[in-house]
Curated annotation (Swiss-Prot):
It is found in: Cell inner membrane. GO terms for molecular function: transmembrane transporter activity. This is Protein TsgA homolog. Belongs to the major facilitator superfamily. TsgA family. The gene is tsgA. It is a multi-pass membrane protein. The keyword Iron does not apply. The keyword Transmembrane helix applies. Its main location: membrane.
Length: 394
């Protein structure tokens, strides 16, 4: 593979994470406007976004096998067509069923693209470089989380219809589409058998289970928190939508900066120990945010939370890939799928909590999930295989 093609494929990976980040994170900003558009309570409206998360989960799960059957390039081109259909559905269709179908299509496109992006990074890069590349790739999720809430808040403040926010997000896929047409992709499945190394079957071990559950709890906790921050800030502290959007953007700015910094720092630490420390600090930072009565402190706490939690998810995935001597794409996809289950469950879990006990209770639940991540990471120390496989970095 020549270097220019590798760079194009790497940028496809970056944009795939940005696309998923934009679709998932912008929900908290536009949800109130969409609920008003369809004349529904916001707690009921949140349930329809489960279609987005379900699409992501199903496509990531199935694509572990479909990547070996349908060429990656064809999948991405088809994804572009689906993206156009979904955006057109939001603009032309004015009923809840078409909205739900469009959200599901967004999820399918996002999941396919993200799973391909993750595979490309793990396929093209080895060893320490893989972990730092995954972390940098994941930072584009955060970058989208920084840019699109601000853009969405600006559009909504100017009374521009909410569906134009999704049209703006669609521009990311235009970039993916153009790069796809110019790139050559790795060949998977039977056609690649002759060129591939013999597959070494290894038992994953109980450590993978701990990592998978931690990934689920982390994503569910993170999204369960960040999706309700705008509603919490506007209703509890009487902030306007721009101020609430700025809180969300502050989180993702800090998250992105943290990813860039930790991509250099992590190589000097044992991954299991550092992720345990980061999970503890993130739990504390979220507790301070949820507990404070002073709105002036919210920005400080959410900045701290974004920074210390930035490396947790990617480190969990990297630790998973190090549980076997030979990295297993299916193992990585399994942990990624479990994280996506957390995405899908976001409104399934938090929607009823908000309806029955209020937004603050949903944020407290998210804090409890972060505590669970800390406990799982601590327990992982007794089961992890990355040290015995010689994967410890110094």
């Amino acid at each position: 593979m020549n270097n220019s093609n590798r760079i194009r494929l790497t940028w496809i990976s970056y944009l795939s994470y940005a696309l998923t980040g934009a679709l998932v994170i912008v929900t908290g900003i536009v949800m109130g406007n969409i609920a008003e558009y369809f004349n529904l309570p916001i707690a009921s409206m949140s349930n329809t976004f489960t279609f987005l998360n379900a699409g992501i989960l199903i496509s990531i799960f199935l694509n572990a096998w479909l990547m070996e059957i349908i060429p990656l390039k064809r999948q991405l081109v088809f994804g572009f067509i689906l993206m156009l259909i979904a955006i057109a559905g939001l603009m032309v269709g004015h009923n809840l069923m078409i909205f739900s179908i469009s959200m599901f299509i967004f999820g399918v496109v996002s999941g396919i693209t993200m799973s391909i992006g993750t595979f490309l990074v793990t396929h093209m890069y080895e060893g320490r470089q893989r972990g730092s590349r995954l972390l940098f790739t994941d930072s584009f999720f955060s970058m989208a989380g920084m840019i699109f809430p601000i853009a969405a808040a600006m559009l909504l403040a100017r009374h521009i219809e909410w569906y134009w926010v999704y049209a703006c997000i669609g521009l990311l896929y235009v970039g993916i589409f153009v790069l796809t047409l110019c790139s050559e992709f790795p060949v998977l499945g039977h056609k690649a058998t002759d060129q591939s190394k013999p597959v070494v079957k290894e038992k994953w071990g109980v450590g993978v289970l701990f990592l998978a559950i931690a990934a689920l709890c982390y994503i569910l906790g993170q999204l369960g928190f960040i999706q309700w921050v705008p509603e919490y800030a506007t209703k509890t502290f009487n902030m306007n939508i721009s101020q609430a959007g700025q809180l969300v953007s502050n989180f993702w700015i800090s998250y992105m900066i943290g990813m860039w910094i930790f991509s250099f720092i992590l190589r000097f630490f044992d991954l299991q120990r550092i992720v345990t420390v980061l999970a503890a600090m993130a739990t504390l930072a979220m507790y301070l945010f949820v507990s404070t009565d002073n709105p002036a402190y919210l920005s400080y706490y959410i900045l701290a939370l974004g920074f210390v939690s930035s490396a947790i998810y990617t480190t969990l995935i990297t630790l998973g890939s190090l549980q076997t001597k030979v990295s297993s794409p299916k193992l990585v996809n399994f942990i990624l799928t479990c994280g996506t289950v957390g995405t899908m469950l976001t409104f399934v879990v938090t929607g009823p909590i908000v309806a029955n006990n209020g937004v603050h209770a949903a944020l407290e639940t998210a804090n409890g999930l972060y505590l669970a991540v800390f406990i799982l990471c601590l327990a992982l120390g007794f089961f992890t295989k990355h040290r015995s496989h010689g994967h410890v970095t110094h």
